Amino acid sequence: MICNLLETISTKCQSLITNKKSFFYCALLMSLLSFSQSKISDQKVFLITLDGLRWQELFLGADSLLVKNENYVKHPEKLYDWAWREKPKDRRLALMPFVWNEVIEMGQIFGNRNLGSKVNLSNGMWFSYPGYNEILTGKADDQNIFSNDKIPNPNETILEQFAKTYDPVKVAAFASWDVFDYIVNQERSGVYTNCGFESSTDLPLNKEEILLNQLQNQIPSPWGTVRLDGFTHQYAKVYLDKHQPDFIYISYGETDDFAHDGDYESYLKAAKNTDNLIKDLWKYAQQSNYYKDKTTFIITTDHGRGTNPIDSWKGHGDEIEGSDQAWIIMFGKGVSNKGEISKTNQLFSNQIAPSIREFLDLPQKKEEGYGIPINLN
């Protein structure tokens, strides 16, 4: 990678500089390599998260104990009709057709624990802010990140690292949850964020942004801190059109909030809708000369949920078994096609940021606790 090459050459140059001529050639070489790092690489990354979607629904589809349970489903027969199939592979296909029809043929899907593929959190909190910090930095920080309070993240995310290394306009974050301004530390990082119920401030606004701002104020959300994912998705697409970012992060939130509400029907509908939103982003990338054949998609979740007792599916946290169980999907440039990983392996959420650093030629963090890139060969 170019960053590693720069570091090596810098060290060599320091040992070689004994006169002005050597200094001149080393400085010229370093400047050329730095220019190539920021101008030549055509790698793009779309990082996407689905808040609190269990691995069980992703890999097995609708839960037999919940799909007709009137405590959690208002219209059991309607849900059963579209979501239920006898075989798990058919159920998951009904729930997330893009993932199981198309992504499985062009990437790698980790986290089916029934097949021995495991993904876990390395943080000990097992809820959202610590989970997103781990995903976006590559390291758990239980000492500083132990609540969902709106506290500026003391840690540098890969978004901030990208903004400082390259062009800050070429990176952005869009999220349904209003805490992300603090998770990304928008004020310090300078990364453009549009989170919660924020209107677009990406001046000058175009017609789409003006309309989205109006609609967001006119259409109520079921929650006070999380907007509907359709707004997050459309704000992100407008930014893609206006700025063609090389690194974009989109965080969808409906799955977690419907689960907390105990509404299994809406939880499944949100998962199915998000599958379609991801398909829309992939289609967008394939129709763009800027993104086609140059883009890696990485999709994951910030935490799992409970299974036993049955009511624990609504919640998560270190007191609920299974809340540390996650999953990872990767496809696109640089990802070999292995489909659903069926061999025994153990990944952690702290490996996502290092993998993105590798894709985007960003320096790796070498301190203890940081994950290592995922082996995609």
Please give the residue ranges for each predicted region.
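Bacterial Sec-dependent N-terminal signal peptides
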Residues: 1-42
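Metal-dependent active-site segment of extracytoplasmic phospho-/sulfohydrolases and closely related
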Residues: 46-47, 55, 274-314, 356
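Short, structured active-site-proximal loop/turn typified by the sulfatase FGly-forming signature C/S-X-P-X-R
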Residues: 56, 60-125
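Short, solvent-exposed loop/turn and secondary-structure capping segments
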Residues: 56-62, 114-115, 146-148, 174, ...
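Histidine-centered active-site microenvironments of extracellular/periplasmic hydrolases
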Residues: 69, 300-331
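Catalytic-site neighborhoods of secreted/periplasmic enzymes
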Residues: 124-215
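Non-catalytic, well-ordered alpha-helical segments in soluble enzyme domains
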Residues: 165-166, 343-376
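Active-site His/acidic residue clusters
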Residues: 234-280
